[in-house]
Structures are given as structure tokens and as C-alpha cells.
């Protein structure tokens, strides 16, 4: 990555755990064809009943948020606290609402987390495949604010699951995993560019550094959503005045006041030392009422696996708008983002109805 020196840009801008990414010198990912999610649509209950589903969270009950650090699922507070919102929802009784207050630091809103299974027995390591789908809504204030110092707010972190024995009493013994793990695979509005991007790992591994962005070299440029059709979603488009990421560029952006759908597929390959080699990561995005579109297809790639002795496995998802580097000195409009219909599955998940 010589022409634009993105490695330097990422290192300078995003340094905290859970931040954006510094590009390593790992696998140069190509963009093999990847099928779109299955034809047809389904409501939340129908999607939850499909074969392979491991966990569904509708954010319809106070019990969904009741857990805390050391529990199987729950929420953690930041400058504000996640709450259920019965007035804005994709389905059911309520949704999960995050508030981004004025003059808030990086942890603007806290986080929600859940393991893939209640007994911690369903986790994924080498030669495995799983999917995570959620719906998300954004207020105009949240999308339109450029947050001073912010490296870009996150949407979801898919990372290491807790180990058997994790509870509030044992949480300091290494059995409970935080959002910042070697495995983490993250969807983020990197550099506040206005569209979803992805990166891997809070630590790095043999072939690449920490926060390794999924950016495909393209001549003297980079594809940031590398599965988009011509004229593509390019780094250079983010630096024009005005920006051309969305026209003529084909980046899939965020849209206010509608329930967008995001689905991530992770397919791990065989373990080689501290990596799962020949792995693939896929991201689909859909606007409300429209079919999913392929945004990112990344691989073959060496996903960080941590050392074999750590025995970390994918098994936990975090939902959060954490924004590394965000200045608490900035006065800005209060923003909001909502989540609903979280599904974790062994098989691809249909689009919402």
C-alpha cells in the first residue's frame, strides 16, 4: 500500500483499542463472487424459526438488557445508558436505543452484548461458518454530525465468546471477554466517511497488524466496499469536493429514519499458528423494503485467531456506537441510533419483510 499510505493514516488517527485500523501487510484480498442472501423476505419470527438459527433478540423485554459484565448477555453504560424504546421499533414491543449526547467522550452510549448461546457451547474456530444479522436505524443528527476527533463510530463487533465459568465473580480471571479481542471483526463508519467498512483484530497476528482494514488495492487507489460495481467505492472518492462516494461512486451509505439491515458472514479456514488462514468475510446491506446488496467480500484472508493456547473462538457480538477519539469538548446535537431484530445463525438469513 505505497501510493496513499493508508497505514500511516490509520495509525495516526485511530490508536485506542476498538478504534479503526492500521493496515498490515497480510493477505491482499481479492473479491470472489459471493451469493446474495436467499431470495424472498420474512418477518422476524419466521427468520428466527429457520434452520440453523442460534439466537434471536427482539429487544422487547427488560430482561434483554438486564445483564451486566460477567453475564451471558446484557448492557453496559457509557456517557448514556442503552434503553428499550417502545416508540421506535422494527417489530415487537420495542427496540434498543442508544443516545449520543452532546459533549460526550468516545464511549458515548454504552454497549449491548450477547454470547451466541446461553450455555457457551456454541462457538466457532477453524473451518466454520456463521452469520450475524441486525437492523439499525439512524437519526439525521447522528448521521450529519462530524464528531471532533472521532475515528468513526462502530456498529457491531463480532468477537471472542466468554469461556465456561464466566460470571460476575470470575470476570477478572480471564474467563469473560471484552469487546477488544484478537478475533474481533468490526463494522464501522471508519473516518466518518458515511458508509460501513470493516476491519479485523484488536491485536494483530503474524501476517497483519491490529485494526487491519478490509481495503482492496486498486491501481493507485483502494476499494473501501470492495464488492461494489463500477465505478466502485473508492478511497479517492472520499477526498473530492464534493465527495463522490455515492454518485458516481457506488458506496452503500447510511440513510436516516429508516430500518436498514446489515448481515455479516464469517467463514474461517484452517488454523496456522495464530491465524485462521483462507478465511472469508462478507457484508450485505439493505435499505428498508429493498433487497440486500453485497458491499464487502474479503478473502482469502488470515483472520487473527490469537495463540492456540488462548483457545479463543468467535462467540459474542457487541452492538455499540463507540467512537474512538471523540472529543467531549464538542457541543453538538444529540444523536440517536436504534437496533432491532438481532439474529445469529449457522445459515444465511433471509431479508426482513
Locations of regions flagged by a protein language model:
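C-terminal motif of bacterial Sec signal peptides marking the signal peptidase cleavage site
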Residues: 14-16
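Bacterial signal peptide processing site
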Residues: 18-22
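Ser/Thr-rich, Pro/Gly/Ala-heavy low-complexity intrinsically disordered linkers and tails
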Residues: 1, 23-38
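Low-complexity, Ser/Thr/Pro/Gly-rich disordered linker/stalk regions
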Residues: 31-353
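Sec-dependent signal peptide recognition
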Residues: 1-9
Amino acid at each position: 500500500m505505497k501510493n496513499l499510505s493508508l497505514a500511516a493514516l490509520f495509525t495516526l488517527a485511530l490508536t485506542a483499542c476498538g478504534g479503526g485500523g492500521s493496515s498490515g501487510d497480510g493477505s491482499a484480498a481479492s473479491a470472489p463472487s459471493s451469493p446474495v442472501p436467499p431470495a424472498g423476505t420474512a418477518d422476524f419470527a419466521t427468520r428466527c424459526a429457520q434452520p440453523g438459527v442460534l439466537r434471536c433478540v427482539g429487544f422487547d423485554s427488560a430482561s434483554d438488557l438486564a445483564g451486566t459484565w460477567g453475564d451471558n448477555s446484557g448492557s453496559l453504560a457509557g456517557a448514556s445508558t442503552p434503553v428499550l424504546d417502545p416508540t421506535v421499533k422494527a417489530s415487537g414491543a420495542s427496540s434498543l436505543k442508544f443516545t449520543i449526547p452532546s459533549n460526550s467522550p468516545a464511549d458515548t452510549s454504552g454497549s449491548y452484548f450477547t454470547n451466541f448461546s446461553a450455555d457457551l457451547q456454541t462457538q466457532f474456530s477453524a473451518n466454520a461458518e456463521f452469520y450475524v444479522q441486525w437492523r439499525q436505524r439512524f437519526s439525521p443528527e447522528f448521521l450529519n454530525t462530524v464528531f471532533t476527533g472521532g475515528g468513526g463510530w462502530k456498529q457491531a463487533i463480532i468477537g471472542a465468546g466468554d469461556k465456561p465459568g464466566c460470571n460476575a465473580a470470575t470476570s477478572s480471571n480471564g474467563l469473560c471477554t471484552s469487546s477488544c479481542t484478537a478475533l474481533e471483526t468490526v463494522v464501522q463508519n471508519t473516518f466518518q466517511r458515511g458508509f460501513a467498512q470493516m476491519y479485523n483484530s484488536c491485536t494483530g497476528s503474524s501476517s497483519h497488524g491490529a485494526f487491519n482494514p478490509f481495503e482492496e488495492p486498486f491501481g493507485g487507489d483502494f476499494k473501501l466496499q470492495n464488492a461494489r460495481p463500477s465505478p466502485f467505492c473508492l478511497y479517492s472518492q472520499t477526498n473530492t469536493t464534493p465527495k463522490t462516494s455515492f454518485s458516481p461512486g457506488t458506496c452503500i451509505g447510511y440513510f436516516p429514519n429508516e430500518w436498514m439491515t446489515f448481515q455479516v458472514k464469517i467463514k474461517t479456514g484452517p488454523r496456522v499458528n495464530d491465524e485462521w488462514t483462507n478465511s472469508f468475510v462478507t457484508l450485505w446491506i439493505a435499505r428498508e423494503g429493498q433487497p440486500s446488496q453485497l458491499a464487502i467480500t474479503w478473502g482469502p484472508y488470515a483472520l487473527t485467531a490469537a495463540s492456540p493456547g488462548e483457545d479463543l473462538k468467535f462467540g459474542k457480538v457487541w452492538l455499540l456506537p463507540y467512537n474512538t477519539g471523540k472529543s467531549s469538548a464538542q457541543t453538538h446535537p444529540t444523536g440517536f441510533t436504534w437496533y432491532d431484530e438481532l439474529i445469529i445463525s449457522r445459515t444465511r438469513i433471509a431479508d426482513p419483510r
